[in-house]
Structures are given as C-alpha cells and as structure tokens.
Amino acid sequence: MARLIKTLSPKEDKKPSSNAALQNFLKTATHYNNVIPQETIISSGSLILDSDAQVRSGMIVRLVGKGSELGKSAQGFVFLENYMKTMPNSKALYIKAEGRLSKKKLDKTGLKFTYNIEDWTEGTVFIVCSNIAEPIFKMIVDTVHDAYHAGEHIAWMIDSMDGLILEDDLKKGVTSGGMVAGVPKLTKLLFRHLALPNMHYDSLGVITSQYSAQIKIDTYSPNAPNQGSSSSGSSAQHQADYVFEYQTINQGDLILENNALKPDKFTNKILGKFARVKVLKSADDITGNMYSVPIRRGEEYKGSNQIWRSYELADLLIGYELVNKGGAWLTFESDIIEDARTEGVEILEKINGINKLYAYLEENEAIMEFLKKKILALIQQ
C-alpha cells in the first residue's frame, strides 16, 4: 500500500527557532540591553595619571590606602568635580559614612555642598549622613535609575566603606558575640546591586577605604580566610574597574623650598608633596604601575587646582621627549618652538635646571596652556 506524503506549504515549512526564550526574557525580565552607555572619559585631574588611566562614565573606582591624609578623599572629590564638568545635567551624592570630614576640608574641594534636597541641583553635591549599608545601596540604585529617566547624570561617592554596617549587625549591639560584616561582604553586596545600572546609566562610583584588620569582637571565633592586602578584599580587585592604592607619604615625597635640606617651619617650608599612586586594578593594562602626582599646599588652591600643573607638565614634556636633557640643560624640540611661534607663543630654546623649568612654566600661563594642549593631544592618540 502506497504511503501518503504530506507536502508542506511555504508557511508551514518553518525551522524551529532558538529565539523564543530570549525574546520572552527581553519582554518580561529586568535588563539593560536597550540602554547603551556613552563611556565618556572623566579626568582624574592629573595629566600624569590621565596619560595612562582612562576612567570613564559607567565605571566604579576604588581608592585605598593605609593611613590618613594620603589624598584618597581629595581625589574622590576631584572625580566628582570633573564628572559634573563633563556630563550634561549632572550632580553628585556624597555618602558621609564616617564623621571625620570637617567643614574646612569640604571647603578645600571647591565644590558646592548641600544637606537640603530642594537645593540639590545641577553641579551640586548632596551630603548623606548615614552608614547603614542596605538603605544606602538601595537609595543609590534608585537615584541612578531615576536620574537616567529624568535625563540627568549622577556621580556618587562612599567615604568610606569601612564606616558602613549592615542593619542586622547594628541590631546586635557592640557587646554581642560574633563578627560583623567586613568590607569584602559589603563591597560584594554593593556591586551585585549597582554594577549594571551604574554602567549602563553612565553614572560614576567612587569608593574609599583603608587597610584594616577584620573587625572581630569574639576573640574565640575562628579566623576568616585572608582576602587580600586591603580592607576591600578580593571583591574590589575583581569588580572595580580601577583600584588606586595611595602610598604612605615619606620625607622624600615632600616638595620643599630647598629639597636638599630637611623641612623646617620657618627656614624651609613644605610647599607640597608627591602623592604616590599604585594601580592595583585597571581597565587599560596598567596594573602595577606607580605614578607620582604633585600636590601643592595653600588655602588658595581648591579641588583639581591643588595638583601642581607646572611640575606635572615638565615631567611629561621630558617623558614624551618634547624636552631633551643634556647635563643640567633642558632643550625644547625645534618643532615645538616653531608650532608655538605660529600661535603667537614664544618659548625659550634652553633652560638650565629642572627647578628653573618649573618656574618658567609657572610664570608663563600662555606657554603652559600651549604645552598642555600638546601633551593632551599625545595622551588622547
């Protein structure tokens, strides 16, 4: 008996599709596939650091170090400053998780702070005085989300993770047994909630923390596994885009009136310092690199203006071989001199000694701006 073979019409002749489950997911689940981040470069304020590190909107930056006055908080505020200068319709959140930041230090940032939600407008920083982790994390996630849908951009800074505590640990009290959650657990919790929206909504996150031993109230409880040299633990190295480690300031890092002598309050004043920054994690293959950023003292210098431009520029000119060393003499490349002349800027061919080069740049704003543009063009190639 002959078998009947059914002939399919063109409409019926369809292959099984693997797209159905994905299409259903995209229709029903929470995702960020339709939100394309701009990944705009945000300056660290330092030409030296920016010459290699390319921090962008959507990233989270960790600033760690052992000790105070290393420059962690100051650098964090510079990131907030430059984010608000770069991103349209932007403002910032500052989570004051520790009570140590004085009004004087806030004034030093050059930023406009407010505690009043009605005054939190474009270009300002709202201070949140709280250290309870869960509501802070939720608030940041919700604020970043709401800002995106309002056509705004948000930078946020937690200063510091060491000051945060979980709600359950707060309820235990200071005398109850057991360990409270350390920074590694808090960091992991934060990144699980915030990493994706922060990236796709072009926010910028800055987190400071110190080196610290694990908080341990019960002396008989077993030691936890070692999770890394800093209080940020392994989660920082794996989940942050950049981790900058600020080194202890030694006498050799000080910038003095006379660097050949010891500092003295009256006869050899401290003019500034070199903040040494080691990259523990990077998005640009610069992990392990060390950078020295010159910082100048003085109440008149605020925010990113605390970075000593003439020192940075001189070092970069030598590094990029736009200025050549020959004994004590420093000679500008002839091409640079000619390019400057076409723009109405006259540059000396030779200068005797690095200190005189610093002074020459400091005293000639037009020359410094011209050379800064040249360096920026090389950095951005």
Predicted regions and their residues:
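The Walker A/P-loop phosphate-binding site
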Residues: 3-119
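Helical mechanochemical/support elements of P-loop NTPase systems and associated helical scaffolds
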Residues: 18, 41, 45, 59, ...
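Conserved catalytic network of the ASCE P-loop NTPase/AAA+ motor domain
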Residues: 53-56, 83-88, 112-115, 145-151, ...
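Conserved inter-motif catalytic segment of the P-loop NTP-binding fold
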Residues: 66, 86-179, 184
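Conserved NTP-handling cores and scaffolds of large molecular machines
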Residues: 83, 87, 113, 144-148, ...
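A structural signal for short, well-ordered beta-strand segments and their strand-loop junctions
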Residues: 94, 156-158, 206-208, 245, ...
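Phosphate-binding/switch region of NTP-binding enzymes
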Residues: 180-320
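Terminal-proximal interaction/regulatory segments of ATP-powered molecular machines
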Residues: 328-381
